Amino acid sequence: MNLNFSLACETQASSFYGGFRPFIKYPSLQHSPGSVKEGDNKGANRSLKKATPWLRVSLERPYKYRTTLNARPVFFNRCFDKGRFKSLILWCILNFGEQKTVELVEQLKDIGYHQATLAGVSLGIDDLKIPNSKAQLVAEAQLENQLILQEDLRGNVTSIEKFQRLIDTWHLTSETLKDNVIKAFRNTDILNPVYMMAFSGARGNVSQVRQLVGMRGLMADPQGQIINFPIQSNFREGLTLTEYVISCYGARKGVVDTALRTATSGYLTRRLVDVAQHVIVYQFDCQTTRGILLNTIKVGNTTSISLQKRLVGRVSAEDIYNSKTNTKEVSRNQEITPILAEQISQNHNQVLVRSALTCQAKHGVCQLCYGWSLAQGSLVSLGEAVGVVAAQSIGEPGTQLTMRTFHTGGVFSGDVMEQIQAPHNGIVEFQTALQGTLIRTSHGKIAFLTYTKGELTLKNTTKAQRGLNHHLSSSLTQTVVGETKIIFPSYTILYVRNGEAVKHKQFIAEYSSLVGENQSIKSSQKVNAEMTGEVFFENVFLRVESSEESEKTYRSFKFSDIWILSCVTNTLKFKSNFSLTKPGDRINTATVINQVLLKKTDEGVATQQQSKKALSLPLNTSMEVLGEANKVDFSSKKTCKGLLQTDYKNLGYFYSFQNKLTKKAKSFDHSTSHLSRKGTVSLVQKNNTKSVNELFFKYGKPNLSGGSDLFKGSTSKGSPEGATGSLPVSSLNKDPFVTWYSSLFKAKYSGFYTPSTAPFTDTRMSQPAFRLAKKTANKKPPTLPCKYWGKGSFLLRNLSEVELFSNRNPGVFKRLESMTGLLSQQVYQDCYANQKILLTPFSPNTLQHSSPNTPKGVLRDGKSVVGRSNPPQHFHGSVGGGCPSKQVSAGPKKGLRAKHSEACFAIDFGETKTKTITKGRYVSQLNCKKEKRLLAKTSRMFSTLKVEFWLFENLTLSLVTHQHFPQYSYRSVEGPPTGMLGLWLLNNSFVLKQLVTNLETVASVGLPFGVVLNQNTNQNLNGSELLSQSLLNSSKKVEGPGRSASSGVLRAGSVGVDWLYFSSANTYLGKVSSGFENNKTQLIKSGQGVKQNFDQSLISQETILLASALKQLSNKQKTWPSLAFYNTLTFKNNNELGQSQLFNTGELDNNASNKSSVFSTGKSLLCHNPVLSKICNTTTFITPFNIKDRGVAPTELQLKQENKCIATQSSFLCNPTNLTPKVFLTTNYPGKVACSCVGGDVGKDTFVKVNLSQFDFIESNQSRFVPTLSFTSTLNRVNAVQQISLTKPHIYQKFFLSAQRGSYHLKTKKTLQGSPGLSYSGISNYSVSHHRSKKAESHTLPLRLNYAVKKVSRVDEERIPLRKKPKTDITKVFSIPELDWNVKLRLPSINSPETQGKNKAGVSYLVKLDLGVQRPQTAVSGRVDIFQRGLGDSEKALGFKGVAPHSSEKLNVPVFNQTNIFGLADSDASVKAGAVFETSKYTGEILKSIESKQQRLFNTPLGVVEKGLQLQNGQTHLSQLETKTIPSSLSPDSTQISPTQRVLTSDDQKTFNVLGKKPLVKVGDFVRYGDFLTCDKKISVSEPGLVIKITSSKITIRIAKPVLVSSGGVFHVQHGDFIEENAPLVTLTYTRLKTGDIVQGIPKIEELFEARISGTLHNQLAIIFENYKQKFSSAYAARKSLERIQQIIVENVLNVYQSQGVTIADKHVEIIVRQMTSKVRILESGRSGLLRGELVTLESVENANKSIHGQKAEYAPVLVGITKAALDIDKSFISAASFQETTRILSRAAIERKTDFLRGLKENVILGQLIPAGTGFSVSFSPEDPNHSKKVVKLVNQYLFSSDNLTSSTFSHMSRSSH
């Protein structure tokens, strides 16, 4: 449209050209000079040429020319679009005023409608012309995609790179097509209606046109992820059904988006108006000297808003000089016009101008700080409501902003990367060598990233030189004859090499326009398996990362290749040790795969066929003979039906005990040993099951870690799989944990069953345990973070039990549950019954001293008592305590006992128990006669009890409880030597676990027990109370275990009670005291390592490793690490399982899946000096169990950080009734737990929730105290008796005593009496162990400390108002810790002497183990000695242990569990055990090994683990576990876990006919897609795979899928795992630039203005403030940091609008931002009278500080979002109440008696008054007048109450007076 209109005056015309120099920019239209008819042609040309998108108006002479209008017409021969109209109208306003402008606009409107009526545009379908190049572009893109998919098939690109390339390919295609569409319209038909509409400036743009005639392109799914299926059709062609469905979501989103956008934008505007409505121009000049610096805002390398634009309409805050001419360009307070702005911006990068942000006007802003009113082109007038204008200016364009927030998988190349294409064919040459590095781009291509700027020369190879460079952006290339120079910036990615020939349009390089300014975001993407099969690591580089929770993640640190080899799993209906098939056998549907003989033993007793002396074990009926089981085929895999697959291991059944019993032990069949009790051990695998044998290995072969040689030897010997040796390694990796089920309980639980124990699942033995406790979701109980490692934490003790504990008698200790502590709080009460038993051991001593009932006496006594036989009696007592009464009544036999099923005694006990059981009084009763009575009742029972105890212990480690029983049985068997060995093994295993828990107590505890036992049965009691009863001889055995405990227990403890950890402790031994500390640490370490592998099984393996490593290590605690026990923990919390549910398959499965190893925890436990911490714990207990405050146990605790103690809390739920003794494994890993439930009967309800808090568990890991001390604690418990002597007061002495004596008590004070529980003293008796260790007897004593636990005092209880039974509970907790640790310590000291070693062996880590072992007393004693030695080294540490006692009882149980864990080996090992024991340095260890070859196994410090391996028949160790099937397929456990075999079917293979050609590949080679199979290169592979067979005519491959893992990828599988289709394989991580499109539009604006806590602004402000505080005073720093954050917000907001094409003046945003940044938070009030945390305005604090002499207020700047700022009642409560939260604001204002001065607009509108803006400004406001507020009130009163509302005289009076 050309306009011809007259301007009335010539002057005006010249003003237009002169005054408006850079008037308009016409970028795209040719300008012809002749078009202006009259006037200053030069000026006109200049103004047209220099166009900028908006007008710059020079105000130097505008208004003076509004005189006459000369009617000479000016003809603009121009197409007037929207921009030109804007310029014309602005020019008209500035020169003629509003009246004339309105007339002009009216005329323009008429012309427009007139012309539109004459013309018309029709749009037909034929106008939609599709460019011819589309088909070729799409075909090229599809070809590129084929190449990408082939690369993926070959495994050359990661899934992320593949996705990125697909997306980028289509995005590029779509963009290219869009350009072609526009080009086609331009070249063919400019008047095409579609083209005219697209470029008319009306709604819509090119993207709509692209969809009509190009291709719709990529769409996003509802999550904002790009779907890599592009819509290739356009609307003209029509969409296919798939394309239609995909595009529906995007289309609907557009419609919804618009509706929501309007609402959101409206709400944003409302909030902005509310926050700024009171900002009015109040005065001319606020006299401020401050200002803000304006500069050009850039995004990347592109200018977003130029300095010139930002300067127009501002007022300079200082004189500005031209540096070249040294003349003043602008003086202070001068307005900056468009012309001045242009001059300034040419000479200056930044300019200081006045701003609303720095205005000092008290209420609004002043004219100079605000500057021009942009609508007028002149200074804003007084009284203008600039706040409302600002709010409307920002809110109005909101509807034009998008609502999108998107997260694409990386950024489109078109958005970020500028690509350079070759302008012509040529040879690339670089003039100089470039600095840089090779990188792999996001597309998986290798390219060169330059660090510096550079240039390349493209030498022409063709003659056609012209027009070449139009493909390149002109800024980057300059063409020289024959060559093109391309200059590229730094950080360019080059795709070509020097001397490479390139073709026309080939990509040479790309560079980012956003370098440096953008943060990168780390994203991750899960890759799932594309087929079901076996994971094979072809070329993997892993590093292990451990989090605070000791969770391990395996990351690749280089690009790694893994394969999924196709196969299926065949699930066996029964778990069977025997598999008739071997790997490689061909099978069909009729093949017999395995046979199982199911026997149901009506009696609890099962006999082993093999052993010469058949033992009759009184097992629960559940027991079965597992002899055959031992044959399990390792290769076979079991899958868990439930969620996860698990392998069943024979291990679980260590029944081998019996064999052990036999003297010959070796001779007995492994199978016999299999006899394990009813429970089978099952391992739960992580996702996939591992082959059974592997599992076993884990168990069996701790050697994995390093003792592989040993391992191998033993395996081959005993193991049915000759190859077991090799197996173990892999299995280690795999199995997460083992579970065994006892048949009796099958329904209820399995030995390892973690699930039930969910609560403790998390517990990690080590310090992490407390975390675990938290986790235990199941039990509602407190989720303290009990730090206590597992051991103490268990608290589970039934509440009543706890009381018992307090009783003098150790029996009271029933607390056994505490033992669970290892597990961490979760442990269940299940174990309780068992636990009780544990307690008993102490009892004996206690009994003796019972009348005194004084803790200290006990300690002291302990020494004397040590030798006592009383212990057995105690046992009895404990029994009663042990089972929660409910349990007992329920049929303890069945339930608890069942757990123990192995030992008959349990039943009897049960009865007695019941009597005792009253929970609350339990303690006291026990104490007294009751206890005695029980004793009298049945020693056997005791043994059973013992078993239970073990279970508890197991808790920590694994579900050994059941195993315990078996061990028991063995014990029963007479053959002392052999039997002893067998027992030993079991014991060891238990011990191990226990140790872990007790870490601290390690040294002393274990021994003591053993010692006590060693003399007589009585002693046995101590060791494994139950056991001892059954076999007096056994008692010696018991000793053995005790010893173990002392050995490495510490370390081991960390992991979990069940693990072999003890062995590791052994390693410690060598170190002895110093070792202690180290050990802790190391142990942990090792656990971790192991953990990864085993997850389930790991325990045993780990153990083994330990042993061997141990040996070597002896001093280096390092070896310890081998213990991988923690793996067992893998169970992780399966809260779902109830105790009763233990058996549920589902639960089991879950455990398996957790897969993470718990073990790591073990180490953490270790870390703390367990001893100290433990002891401390005890004290703590006494204190009110504040668990949280570990400090509680101050005296002792002081030592170590109490923190550990917090963990303790966890025992939460004890389940008094639930006797179910679940044994829980505790492990380091949080979340994982293994639990065994012994008593099937227990009802779920049984668990009582104990407060963890009660237990003070103070054990802190740290307590470094003397590490040795720590030992005692755990072991102590059962062993305590024996240990006592060890204790040697000194150790304790320090804190222990204090703690014990009064300290605990202190709180408890009277409670002590019964509660003392100190009965531990009995333990001290144990000190007897003396014989062996000359030094250490005294050491043993320390164990006693355990008692210290507060358990007793009722007072405490009251004090703490824990739950009703708190006291008891607490006690329990203690006990746990005590056991293991003590033992461990001791060991180290002993390690040197072999003899000692032997003894140690006897001791075996877990006292519990004792049962199994009949070992000669001597061995026991030896053990003790060892302990003592250890103690000696760290006497203090032992003291620490004091707390442990309770634990120790529990410990015993765990020991059994351990055995189970190793079960497979267990029985055999046991048998050999005697010999095997080869002593290790640690007392706990059974390094002796002399007798049996198996001994290597023993080597592992964790004797237990070794045991499994030991089985003479290698087979036994593993397979036996498997056999456990005896529970029968019907049993719950079986359903949960079934053995599986991996089978290769015909569908998993592909055969290629090679017709006799020479093959290029050999069997075992991997072939990738497209590889050649034969030398003539004619046969290539259509599917990648592994060559499994080559004949003269055929090559068979096993179909496989390669997966490339980028560095930093997280592995969810291990080598050899079985993985289901779509199961997570790896998680790939990648980084991408964080560009503006991550959060866009309104959400981004809202995020900035609301200053959300989650956003980065608060962090930025805090960082800026901290930085400034280092350079300036705090007050200055606060102001500076607010100024900085103001600039950041302003620039961010402007950028968001600019990115959407909306330009808003800075001053509007500044007014809003000023409201957000006016407050500070008071940090220190000083003498200002302000309150800490109060939000006040910066000005008010600065003013207040000026008048203060003395300490001034300290404050930090804060950001207040607009909603919060609008609710600020200090400004106006009327305005705030009308915005939101009316009632709250009005009531608060009323309470505070606020006055509203009605300064804003809203308040006045609400009250119906004249608003104080515009005309009303002069009437009502005079801010400088001090009496202003009084006048306002007067005015208001007049207005409201006078009949003659505000007369003019009032107004004039007001204005006069105010001025």
Swiss-Prot record:
- Which positions carry the signal peptide feature in this UniProt record? none
State the free-text cofactor note. Answer: Binds 1 Zn(2+) ion per subunit.
Which Pfam families does the UniProt record give? RNA_pol_Rpb1_4, RNA_pol_Rpb1_5
> One GO cellular component from the entry?
chloroplast
Cofactor names: Zn(2+)
- E.C. no: 2.7.7.6
Q: Which residues bind Zn(2+)?
A: C286, C359, C366, C369
* Keywords in alphabetical order: Chloroplast, DNA-directed RNA polymerase, Metal-binding, Nucleotidyltransferase, Plastid, Transcription, Transferase, Zinc
The record lists the catalysed reaction(s) as: RNA(n) + a ribonucleoside 5'-triphosphate = RNA(n+1) + diphosphate
Instruction: Recall the GO molecular function terms of this protein's record.
Output: DNA binding; DNA-directed RNA polymerase activity; zinc ion binding
Where in or outside the cell it occurs: the entry states: Plastid, Chloroplast
Subunit composition?
A: In plastids the minimal PEP RNA polymerase catalytic core is composed of four subunits: alpha, beta, beta', and beta''. When a (nuclear-encoded) sigma factor is associated with the core the holoenzyme is formed, which can initiate transcription.
Q: What does this protein do?
A: DNA-dependent RNA polymerase catalyzes the transcription of DNA into RNA using the four ribonucleoside triphosphates as substrates.
Q: Which NCBIfam families match?
A: rpoC2_cyan
Q: What is this protein called?
A: DNA-directed RNA polymerase subunit beta''
Q: Which organism is it from?
A: Oltmannsiellopsis viridis (Marine flagellate)
